[in-house]
Amino acid sequence: MFSNRLPPPKHSQGRVSTALSSDRVEPAILTDQIAKNVKLDDFIPKRQSNFELSVPLPTKAEIQECTARTKSYIQRLVNAKLANSNNRASSRYVTETHQAPANLLLNNSHHIEVVSKQMDPLLPRFVGKKARKVVAPTENDEVVPVLHMDGSNDRGEADPNEWKIPAAVSNWKNPNGYTVALERRVGKALDNENNTINDGFMKLSEALENADKKARQEIRSKMELKRLAMEQEMLAKESKLKELSQRARYHNGTPQTGAIVKPKKQTSTVARLKELAYSQGRDVSEKIILGAAKRSEQPDLQYDSRFFTRGANASAKRHEDQVYDNPLFVQQDIESIYKTNYEKLDEAVNVKSEGASGSHGPIQFTKAESDDKSDNYGA
């Protein structure tokens, strides 16, 4: 069955197919006849059943005939489209006149040719039209029953009462503040003399209380045992440490009375330097010793030293390639004249070698004191 939106099919000669006519044979009638004549072998390709089958090619005459027939059909379609596009029967002429002042002698009228708008001959047929969709009615549609209430849809006061669900009433708490009727209260059943309290409630409460006491007692006993075990462990550690300390004292030969032995007082660096100088037979003043023992700390300079080193040569003309006015390490060379070598000084103090010198530079002499008191070394 073909779609109703497509043009009816035609034969190669241009005749309309009779398959869509009203007197066509229904497919349901021919179904049985087609099924009887069709076999399974008809669906098998011929080359598969017979590999040596030779299919002859079309002759030149047949090819030329098919080409001419196709070319003539296409030419007829093109000529029909061009004939419609070249149709100028709808054209007409219109005379238009403009209004101008009377003193101007001008020809204000001119002719206009009105022609209908040219349409594209290759546009599809259904542009701008809605697709006409035909829906065939279904067969054997069952009638859907309509369910509704008898009478009007207005609800009365009786309808909510029928669907109302009462709230749950608790015997222990009333968070929403509901009013409980007397017949639904728990204490209402106690008024009846026939009802008696079961002894099981009293036994249950006593059993729970005894179990609670027993559990508390077990926890208390466990904590006590744990505390005693920790105390015994601490005592064992202390006794072991005491034993180790006694063994160390015995091996070292120290008295076991427990008296604290004070270490020997270490001599200062100044005293050691004075002793070394006395042993070498040199007279060195305390000022030199103190200067060697205590290194002078110079703060970092926060200014450019070149401002103070040029002096009288500030106005002297220098060479254009001379960037700096002084050598790079001139200040370091000046300081190294009277600078003390601390590494060699430490070696001399510790090793007490005979040929080691404690300082570099000239020896500074101080005035002798008038007191007759002499130091320990006779200096």
UniProtKB/Swiss-Prot annotation:
**Keywords annotated in UniProt:** mRNA processing, mRNA splicing, Nucleus, Spliceosome
Q: Pfam families under this entry?
A: SKIP_SNW
Q: What start and end residues bound the annotated signal peptide?
A: none
Q: What are the GO BP annotations of this UniProt entry?
A: generation of catalytic spliceosome for second transesterification step; mRNA splicing, via spliceosome
UniProt keyword annotation of Plastid present: no
Q: Which portions of the chain have biased composition (kind: Basic and acidic residues)?
A: 368-379
Where is this gene product found? Nucleus
Keyword Nucleus (UniProt): yes
| Broad class of where this protein is predominantly found | nucleus
InterPro entries cross-referenced by the UniProt entry:
SKI-int_prot_SKIP (IPR017862), SKI-int_prot_SKIP_SNW-dom (IPR004015)
Give the Pro residues compositional bias ranges: 1-10
Q: What else is known?
A: Present with 1670 molecules/cell in log phase SD medium.
Q: How does it assemble?
A: Belongs to the CWC complex (or CEF1-associated complex), a spliceosome sub-complex reminiscent of a late-stage spliceosome composed of the U2, U5 and U6 snRNAs and at least BUD13, BUD31, BRR2, CDC40, CEF1, CLF1, CUS1, CWC2, CWC15, CWC21, CWC22, CWC23, CWC24, CWC25, CWC27, ECM2, HSH155, IST3, ISY1, LEA1, MSL1, NTC20, PRP8, PRP9, PRP11, PRP19, PRP21, PRP22, PRP45, PRP46, SLU7, SMB1, SMD1, SMD2, SMD3, SMX2, SMX3, SNT309, SNU114, SPP2, SYF1, SYF2, RSE1 and YJU2. Interacts with CLF1, PRP22 and PRP46. Interacts with SPP382.
State the similarity comment.
Answer: Belongs to the SNW family.
According to its UniProt entry, what is the function of this protein? Involved in pre-mRNA splicing. Associated with the spliceosome throughout the splicing reactions, until after the second catalytic step.
Protein name listed in UniProt = Pre-mRNA-processing protein 45
